[in-house]
């Protein structure tokens, strides 16, 4: 941070980007990326008022600052919160995504080494983890990278994340897009599908306005209900089967997965979900404790939990952000993302028509 002759604080004039490789210590781990930046680059980030953190993975990411603040951005605060969603989606509970023999997109060489991680994908979406989050840059306050699948076959996986320090963010372009959906009640749409043209239009806006460091915010338009946005792997078995089952009947999904862990997927009859309801109350008690909610709110939350809709079961957001950077070609910004990342529109009830409206906002970091 610089100071002018009058003592006024002067912010750096150019955003700075730090690329980090992280090594998780366990399958589920919390890593302070601020500490990683400090240990490798000193106080180079401290002169900026904001920091954008971006994960390039579909089972590791960040929490919004409001949630992270409740949890104190520390392992002691974050882990109980994450454990709630790991309870909802236990590891190895017979998910369709984990039936590797059915994964036609995998090559013969990929199948033996593909991790069985449907639980991590679902916990990522349910727990409202994001791939791209902007934080107020408060030196000394952790910024937690939360990994839900950091170790495979006993070996830590290499994780990549980017941290951009910037002082201000200005809007340079907006647009409204229409995304067609099917007539099905439960639907997931890959917004990266070239046939939709979403990415092409976003890329053109970035090019027209010469954005080199910034982000693209995709938001559901006001009035769009029973839908959400996430960034994850758009794999058919995961999206159409595992996630689809959650959206259609969250309690039954929990019941069947709990039964599967007991060795009998049908241990809890579909017609009676008392066990699932009981487990759900316990889960929400843990969530309330993790977030430090006031006791006066607990009863209200739990009274709604028994008839909990998918919108509460999955804490999915109404917007996602895509990183724009010129780190690969200086002066030419483009969308930067992980190999398997796709923005996904999810609906759990039909809308008024077979389409959803998205608002696009392109911003530049300065």
Please report, for each region that a protein language model flagged, where it lies by residue.
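Active-site histidine-anchored catalytic micro-motif
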Residues: 2-366
């Amino acid at each position: 941070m610089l100071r002018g002759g009058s003592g006024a604080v002067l912010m750096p004039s150019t955003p700075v980007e730090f690329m980090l490789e992280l090594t998780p210590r366990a399958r589920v781990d919390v890593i302070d990326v601020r500490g990683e930046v400090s240990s490798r680059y000193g106080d180079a980030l401290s002169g900026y008022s904001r920091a954008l953190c971006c994960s390039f993975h579909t089972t590791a990411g960040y929490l919004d600052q409001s949630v992270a603040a409740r949890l104190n951005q520390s392992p002691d605060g974050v882990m109980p919160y994450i454990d709630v969603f790991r309870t909802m989606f236990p590891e190895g509970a017979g998910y369709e995504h984990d039936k590797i023999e059915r994964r036609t997109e995998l090559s013969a060489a990929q199948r033996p080494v593909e991790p069985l991680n449907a639980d991590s994908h679902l916990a990522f979406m349910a727990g409202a983890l994001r791939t791209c989050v902007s934080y107020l840059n408060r030196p000394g306050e952790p910024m937690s990278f939360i990994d839900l699948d950091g170790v495979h076959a006993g070996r830590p996986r290499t994780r990549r994340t980017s941290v951009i320090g910037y002082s201000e963010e200005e809007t340079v372009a907006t647009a409204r897009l229409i995304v067609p959906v099917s007539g099905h009640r439960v639907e997931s749409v890959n917004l990266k599908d070239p046939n939709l043209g979403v990415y092409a239009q976003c890329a053109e806006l970035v090019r027209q306005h010469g954005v080199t460091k910034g982000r693209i915010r995709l938001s559901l338009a006001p009035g769009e209900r029973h839908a959400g946005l996430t960034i994850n792997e758009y794999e058919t078995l995961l999206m159409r089967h595992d996630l689809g089952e959650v959206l259609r009947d969250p309690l039954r999904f929990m019941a069947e997965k709990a039964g599967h862990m007991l060795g009998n997927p049908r241990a809890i009859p579909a017609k009676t979900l008392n066990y699932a309801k009981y487990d759900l109350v316990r889960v929400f008690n843990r969530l309330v404790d993790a977030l430090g909610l006031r006791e006066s709110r607990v009863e209200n939350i739990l009274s709604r939990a028994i008839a909990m809709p998918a919108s509460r079961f999955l804490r999915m957001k109404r917007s996602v952000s895509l990183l724009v950077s010129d780190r690969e070609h200086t002066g030419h910004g483009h969308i930067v993302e992980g190999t398997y990342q796709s923005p996904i529109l999810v609906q759990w009830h039909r809308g008024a028509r077979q389409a959803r409206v998205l608002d696009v906002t392109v911003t530049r970091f300065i």
